[in-house]
């Protein structure tokens, strides 16, 4: 037996508020348009009024059109345009209260400048006479039910405790959600044990962060950039959600702005850097260097690729003493590189090791670098190298502001 058509398909739609004898007036809210090139069976009314206040009642619209030419609803009201604009700005629709430590104040201000949806909140960072922290979160009741984030900088063991005290306290203030932004994960290079008795401090810090109290919406989200080893994501427990971001997209934008952007070649100082970043830089020619041991020394050699006549940019996740980058620079220059630059997401530079890098002012790539790009993930380093060639700082503010909306 054939199925009986639905009763709404057999009868015209009816609305008690509109009779069949009444003339429907054109509406300023919506208009119906059809393609004049396709003939219609019958078209009596060009426009009709949509009664949203009585949307559950059926309207009597005697309007026959071709099945091949469906009605197009064209928005022309100011109210609809406003809603469209809101959809276009959905990237920053979530309002976030951003706290920060003293080291990250400048970065926090740059993040807040990205969007009006990010509001800076203050914390009083004081100490007792014995040196232990005396902390106070201003207007604690004002963040109830709101999305809260904290911008941290674990630049030294001494500041970790006071920041952890705040990090553990914020989720307990009845906030809707809590996000920890730690641009540089400081113990990332201590992720493995080679001898019995070695302590993997990366695992220790991951366990500490994994025990941050949950907020009303669930576990804490952790945003960090270019962590040293991707397998460190498995160090974190189930009570934290790591979000691993990268500064490489910012580097690619910077390289596109160079006058010799079509002559760029990417070099990796070792296999680890190649495995970490080569997929994000596939459209560039690549060079891979390798560390080899000769006697008691470890030297850098060219493993594959040709730097002759190219502007070679060395890419790695972090730099400390800078010895590997300098050796790589010398090898590339010896093999004919026209220019040598470098990029690292995290410029740590303990003991002012940044002073080892000189600018190339005479066209001698073996003596200096054309550019040395770092991000502002390590605020103390940014203060030291500011306005000192060849260093240039690429800010993570835009990337962090976008991550706060996740």
From Swiss-Prot:
GO terms for biological process: 5-phosphoribose 1-diphosphate biosynthetic process; purine nucleotide biosynthetic process. Keywords: ATP-binding, Kinase, Magnesium, Metal-binding, Mitochondrion, Nucleotide biosynthesis, Nucleotide-binding, Transferase, Transit peptide. Residues 309-324 are annotated as: Binding of phosphoribosylpyrophosphate. It comes from the Eukaryota. Residues 1-87 form a transit peptide. One of its GO terms (cellular component) is cytoplasm. It is found in: Mitochondrion. Pfam families: Pribosyltran, Pribosyltran_N. SUPFAM superfamilies: PRTase-like. Residues 1-32 are annotated as: Disordered. Mg(2+) binds at residues 226, 228. Its EC number is 2.7.6.1. It catalyses: D-ribose 5-phosphate + ATP = 5-phospho-alpha-D-ribose 1-diphosphate + AMP + H(+). Belongs to the ribose-phosphate pyrophosphokinase family. This is Ribose-phosphate pyrophosphokinase 3, mitochondrial. It comes from Spinacia oleracea (Spinach). The gene is PRS3.
């Amino acid at each position: 037996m054939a199925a009986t058509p639905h009763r709404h398909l057999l009868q015209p739609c009816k609305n008690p508020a509109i009779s069949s004898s009444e003339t429907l007036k054109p509406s300023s809210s919506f208009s119906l348009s059809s393609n004049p090139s396709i003939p219609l069976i019958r078209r009596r009314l060009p426009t009709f009024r949509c009664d949203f206040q009585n949307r559950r009642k059926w309207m009597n619209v005697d309007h026959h059109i071709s099945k091949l030419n469906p009605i197009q609803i064209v928005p022309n009201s100011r109210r609809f345009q406003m809603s469209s604009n809101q959809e276009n700005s959905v990237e920053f629709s979530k309002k976030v209260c951003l706290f920060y430590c003293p080291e990250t104040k400048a970065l926090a201000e740059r993040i807040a400048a990205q969007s009006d949806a990010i509001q800076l909140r203050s914390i009083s960072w004081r100490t007792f006479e014995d040196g232990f922290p005396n902390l106070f979160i201003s207007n604690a009741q004002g963040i109830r039910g709101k999305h809260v984030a904290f911008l941290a900088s674990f630049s030294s063991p001494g500041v970790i405790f006071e920041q952890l005290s705040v990090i553990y306290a914020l989720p307990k203030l009845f906030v809707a959600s809590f996000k920890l932004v730690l641009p540089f994960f400081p113990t990332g290079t201590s992720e493995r044990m080679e001898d019995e008795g070695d302590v993997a401090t990366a695992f220790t810090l991951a366990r500490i962060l994994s025990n941050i109290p949950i907020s009303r919406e669930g576990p804490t989200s952790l945003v960090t950039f270019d962590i040293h080893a991707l397998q460190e994501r498995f160090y974190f427990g189930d009570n934290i959600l790591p979000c691993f971001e990268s500064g490489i997209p910012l580097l690619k934008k910077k390289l596109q702005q160079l006058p010799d952007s079509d002559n760029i070649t990417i070099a990796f100082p070792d296999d680890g850097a190649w495995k970490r970043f080569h997929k994000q830089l596939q459209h560039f020619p690549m060079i891979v260097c390798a560390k080899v041991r000769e006697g008691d020394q470890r030297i850098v050699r060219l493993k594959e690729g040709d730097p002759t006549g190219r502007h070679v940019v060395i890419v790695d996740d972090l730099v400390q003493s800078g010895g590997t980058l300098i050796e790589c620079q010398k090898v590339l220059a010896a093999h004919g590189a026209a220019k040598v630059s470098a990029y690292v997401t995290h410029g740590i530079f303990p003991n002012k090791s940044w002073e080892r890098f000189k600018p190339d002012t005479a066209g001698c790539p073996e003596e200096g670098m054309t550019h040395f790009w770092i991000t502002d993930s390590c605020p103390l380093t940014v203060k030291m190298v500011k306005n000192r060639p060849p260093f240039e700082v690429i800010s993570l503010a835009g990337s962090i502001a976008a991550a706060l909306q996740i």
